[in-house]
Curated annotation (Swiss-Prot):
Annotated function: Forms part of the ribosomal stalk which helps the ribosome interact with GTP-bound translation factors. Is thus essential for accurate translation.
Gene of this entry: rplL
The keyword Ribosomal protein is annotated on this UniProt entry: yes
Biological processes, Gene Ontology terms: translation
Classification of source organism: Bacteria, Pseudomonadati, Campylobacterota, Epsilonproteobacteria, Campylobacterales
Name listed for the protein in its UniProt record: Large ribosomal subunit protein bL12
Source organism per UniProt: Helicobacter hepaticus (strain ATCC 51449 / 3B1)
Length: 126
């Protein structure tokens, strides 16, 4: 029996950030594609559009730039925000920059940034 699109989306929606990253790499290798040109094209279009494109942005990514000196508190905050296991959260804090959340609202992104910065991390919202 075939798997429905909805089942695939549900499965992907339940993956951790690290698992999603591995899935993207597997897609790139299997199908010979790269996610990079999409980002570059978006950046070029954004530059040409001026301020209007920046105002329309509704989805944001939370990127951990540096875990700082207090890594234990940062790992705890990463686990709370992402739902990752201990090992995955530790790996995410050690392999910076690391995208912790993708496609979240500005309000959620700001809340996540605040929690991580209170724990001692350096965070960017993109």
């Amino acid at each position: 029996m075939a798997i429905s699109k909805e089942e695939v989306l549900d499965y992907i929606g339940n993956l951790s950030v690290l698992e999603l990253s591995e899935l993207v790499k597997a897609f790139e290798e299997k199908f010979g594609v790269s996610a990079a040109p999409t980002v570059v094209a978006g950046a070029v279009a954004g530059g040409a559009g001026g301020g209007a494109a920046a105002e329309e942005k509704t989805d944001f990514n939370v990127v951990l730039v540096d875990a700082g000196a207090n890594k234990i508190n940062v790992i705890k905050a990463v686990r709370e925000i992402t739902g990752l296991g201990l090992k995955e959260a530790k790996d995410a804090t050690e392999q910076t920059p690391s995208t912790l959340k993708e496609g979240v609202s500005k309000e959620d992104a700001e809340n996540f940034k605040k929690k991580l910065e209170e724990a001692g991390a350096k965070v960017e919202i993109k």
